Amino acid sequence: MFCHVDVKISSKRYTWTKLPLNVPKLVLIYLQSHFVLFFFSMCQSIWERPAIGRATTSSASWMVGYDCLL
């Protein structure tokens, strides 16, 4: 199982590919003096697209999406 993780914070984009998700993974991002913690559970047997989370702080906004396939 592999995942494509796309994280966009403000105008900067960070991408991880081929993350093995045979076990739950924990991704920690430190950017612009903010800690953003993402927990990716095991992918289901179907496409999960998109799984999007959004949040806004006083100085930055972030968006994350991930696509999973077997």
Curated annotation (Swiss-Prot):
GO cellular component terms listed in the entry, alphabetical order: membrane
Cell compartments where the protein resides: Membrane
Transmembrane segments: 21-43
Extracellular side: 44-70
Cytoplasmic side: 1-20
Record has Coiled coil as a keyword: no
Superkingdom of the source species: Eukaryota
Location, primary (coarse class): membrane
Tissue expression: Highly expressed in B-cell lymphoma and lung cancer.
Bilayer topology: Single-pass membrane protein
Cleavable signal peptide: none
Note: The microRNAs that are encoded in a MIR17HG intron stimulate growth of cultured lung cancer cells.
Record-given protein name: Putative microRNA 17 host gene protein
UniProt source species: Homo sapiens
Gene: MIR17HG
